[in-house]
Amino acid sequence: MADLQEQVQNLNINDDDKNASSYVPPHLRNQRRGPPRHDSPSDGSENNNDFGFGFNNRRGGYNGGSGYRGGNNSYNRRGNYQGGQNNSNNNNNGGGFNRIPGRGSWTNGKHVPGAKNQNLEVQLFGTPEDPQFQSSGINFDNYDDIPVDASGTDVPEAITEFTSPPLDALLLENIILARFTKPTPVQKYSVPIVSRGRDLMACAQTGSGKTGGFLFPVLSESFKNGPSPMPESARKSFVKKAYPTALVLAPTRELATQIYDEAKKFTYRSWVRPTVVYGGSDIGSQIRDLSRGCDLLVATPGRLSDLLERGRVSLANVKYLVLDEADRMLDMGFEPQIRQIVDGCDMPPVGERQTLMFSATFPDDIQHLARDFLSDYIFLSVGKVGSTSENITQRILYVEDMDKKSTLLDLLSASNDGLTLIFVETKRMADELTDFLIMQDFRATAIHGDRTQSERERALAAFKNGNANLLVATAVAARGLDIPNVTHVVNYDLPSDIDDYVHRIGRTGRAGNTGVATAFFNRGNRNIVKGMYELLAEANQEIPPFLNDVMRESGRGGRTSGFSSRNNSNRDYRRSGSNNGGSWGNSRSNSNSGAGGWGSSRSGGAGGAGGAGGAGGAGGSSWGRSGSSGWGNSSSSNAGAGSNAKSSWW
């Protein structure tokens, strides 16, 4: 009794004993208790911007303003950079992406690679036995005989192997992990060109390693030089923005995703955080990805324009602009968006950024327009640009429309077990043909514009891993997709443009390997018969007699639908005397065929027709505003020697 009375007397309603029990609501009783709140910074930034994820939250650490869930945009004050997160403290690691496996940092002006993570390496690079991770099936030795021509002033000498220098040591490790043994021709030149700070226009045949051609030099220089300082305006902004250092524009979501997947490999353990944005997917989740940090942004023009209008992306810090499949983006009507992105936003102007344009074809009119984007650039032509590879065996079969399905069944039954890509012209036909093949017990799937992004991704994944060995596709997959081990391409429906045919069959025979391309031809395809005839002859392929018959029936072989404009697409238009530019500098060419070597060429180029309509009179073709496509016709004459008229995108 005395003990109880003593305990009552000792009670204190202000007792602050931390060990005393307290009431916990039922819905919180099973949750793990977090660390105590602090009013001072923990292991993160001591002076973080108040406008991070936690508004007016000045705490660092995991949930603070500079931790994994915090951070303002992509910058620090050059003391510590964590791959896209803000951290203002010059002395501390401050959380950030060092909490993520395989993520490095930029600390005190130095690149600090992250620790190796074996599980992540397997996810990114696979194993040598995995057919999905075999350097996209690259046969590097077959590249040795491909001729290369580089023209421009002070063309740097090509590299012959991957070494450090000129490549960053961490990038070199990732290249080795990806099992790239030697640079492809386009990579041999792009690495020294970009490291010299030069602009580049590269024309290379499909499957020649163009993605590595721009990722390797851009990432190498980024690893060495670190992030750009944060603009003063970003420190005062209430809206979280991404400030990428490198911007890659691609025409389709599939190509953008493919570039992003490659970027993830080669940014492994680095401070660079890649992000991808494209239409047809939830923009909210993409904005959240951007808010976590973005140093290399891969985007389609339409979605990027949307994000710029929303104020979620700033291009003020872009050092490197890459246009992949540039001609296709213009053909698809993206010219107004590209023009607005490059010239109408806060991107640094020509001369203050490096611009790289990559594609398999660059017709003369595209080259002329490149003058608006490039400064003192080097023109790189690899192989027979704008044509097909001799590694692809082309077979042209005369098949009427009513006989196509039965002919396809015979073709597939006689083929090997490799992956076959079948191109059709319409979405309806893609679904119809896929259903037909499944009913015939073939493992088929399809991609086209009406399928959701997740459906397209699942279809591509099934095709790549072999669960479906037949992929029926519309033109959405014709450009840029790098699917390893495609042994056969079937043009069930031929396109109306010979350039599209070139890019379709380029899905096989990639990167020095061999492949087969079969086309179903009939008189409904007479508009490309001349272009196809010349293409087969150029690639030393067998020309079926019926092509000659159809050419004779159509007089001159019909309209070539763009083939004639491609004939000189592997030449630098600045060498022509009909274009402005005055005297020309040196050019380098390299061929292992025996007679090739280094040399120089000079050609006069004073004066010339300056108008976009060319040297013709009234009715000359030109670029102009025409609805949303960006194409138009000019009826005015811009001819005349020394004309000061300038081609315009508008």
UniProtKB/Swiss-Prot annotation:
List cellular component terms (GO): cytoplasmic stress granule; spliceosomal complex
Where is there biased composition of kind Polar residues? 1-13
- Primary location group: cytoplasm
Q: Does the keyword Lyase apply?
A: no
Q: Which parts of the sequence bind ATP?
A: A204, Q205, T206, G207, S208, G209, K210, T211
Per the Swiss-Prot or TrEMBL annotation, the motif DEAD box is positioned at 324-327
All residue ranges annotated as the Helicase C-terminal domain in the record: 391-551
Q: Which residues form the Helicase ATP-binding domain?
A: 191-380
Q: Which SMART domains match?
A: DEXDc (SM00487), HELICc (SM00490)
Q: Where is this motif: Q motif?
A: 160-188
- Gene3D superfamilies for the chain: P-loop containing nucleotide triphosphate hydrolases
The record describes the protein's role as: ATP-binding RNA helicase involved in translation initiation. Remodels RNA in response to ADP and ATP concentrations by facilitating disruption, but also formation of RNA duplexes.
Family statement drawn from the similarity comment of this UniProt entry: Belongs to the DEAD box helicase family. DDX3/DED1 subfamily.
This protein is called what?
ATP-dependent RNA helicase DED1
Species, as recorded:
Vanderwaltozyma polyspora (strain ATCC 22028 / DSM 70294 / BCRC 21397 / CBS 2163 / NBRC 10782 / NRRL Y-8283 / UCD 57-17) (Kluyveromyces polysporus)
Q: Which gene encodes it?
A: DED1
